[in-house]
Structures are given as structure tokens and as C-alpha cells.
Amino acid sequence: GYLKADFTQERFHTDFTTWYLGWIASQVDLHDPAHHKHINPHQLLDNLADYDFPAYEGFLTSLGVSMHLSWHFGYFTRAQYPLGISLMADIIRSGAGKNPFWITEMQGGNVTASGREVLCPTAREITQWLWTGIAAGAEGVIFWTLNQRASALEAGEWGMLDFQGRPSDRLPAASEVARTAKAHKSFFRE
């Protein structure tokens, strides 16, 4: 009796996830073949072994990544968050293959209770994170979320708007990045 590493269960999980996502994509195609198919892996750095991104290229039309910094960036200090964004973007860009990749959940506002770390991004950080994602090749960035929920676990958190529904300083910062990227679209598409 020597101990041996047995990853049969983990391999099954990865293979089953790939099969199941492919099956879901086939069902979407059955009913709406023109519909885009996209997934948004959560906790990427902790769950990377669960995914077989190259296998997804055949049935997805784009690949995204969730970047809730207060959840997903425990390996980094706050000053290193741009490095974490770049790392996760590189992983997803590589995994997307010929398909585009998006940052489909970028933390947009404060988190005090529904994350692992208390964090309220500054307008400068939002600007830096967006440019880091764009420089890494992301075709788009979607924030979580525009406005805070009124109830439940995430109540009062994550929003780009303040508690009175007015833009926080983060929203105009994000808008300025979007305006600049749009004004120089050909440069960013090369």
C-alpha cells in the first residue's frame, strides 16, 4: 500500500460539465440557432481545473469571466488587482480560442457584506480596470451592477449608482473610457 493520487472524480466533473454545457448549447440551437451562446465562469482562479475551455470553443459563440474583485482576487493585494485582471483576461482570451471574450461581471460598486473582502472601487480604479481589460483584448465589459438591490443578501451593494439613484463618480469614469474607446474604435480593433 502506497498512497496514490486519484483524480477520477475531478476528471468526471470536468468532462460532465463540458458534456452538459454542450447539451444545453444543442438545445438552444434546436429552438433558436441564431442565438449566441455564452458562459461566465465564476471564481476562475479557484475553479480553473473545473473547466475545459478549448472544448467549449465548438459550441459557444463567446466566453466571459466574472471579475468581482472582492470575491475573486484573494491572491492579490489591492495594488495588484490590475495584474489579477490581466491574468484572468489572459486565461479567458486563451480559452475562448477563435471566439471573442468579455469581462461579463466587473465589480462596479461597494461591497461590505456579500463579498469576501470589503471593497469600494474608486473612479480611478474603475478606469484602470477597464483599460486593463481592453488592453487584454476584451470585446466588452459589463458591470455588476448599475443599481443596488433593495433587498436580499446583496442589498445596497455592487452599484454604479448611489443610494439615491444618482451616478457615483465611478459611472462617469466608466463612461469616459467607453467614449474614448468608441472614438478610437479602429485602433482598439487592430
Task: Walk through the language-model features, giving the residues of each.
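Short leucine-rich amphipathic alpha-helices used at interfaces
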Residues: 7-8, 14-15, 80-81, 86
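Short glycine/proline- and acidic residue-enriched helix-loop micro-motifs
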Residues: 2-11, 162
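Short low-complexity stretches enriched in small and charged residues
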Residues: 13-24, 55-64, 151-159
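Carbohydrate-binding surfaces of carbohydrate-active enzymes
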Residues: 77-190
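Substrate-binding cleft/loops of secretory-pathway carbohydrate-active enzymes
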Residues: 31, 36-75, 79, 110-122, ...
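Aromatic-lined carbohydrate-recognition surfaces of secreted/lumenal glycan-active proteins
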Residues: 10-50, 99-110, 141-146, 190
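Active-site phosphate/pyrophosphate- and oxyanion-stabilizing loops and adjacent acidic/basic residues
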Residues: 26-27, 54, 90
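Short amphipathic alpha-helical segments, especially helix-boundary/capping motifs
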Residues: 1-4, 65-67, 105, 152-156
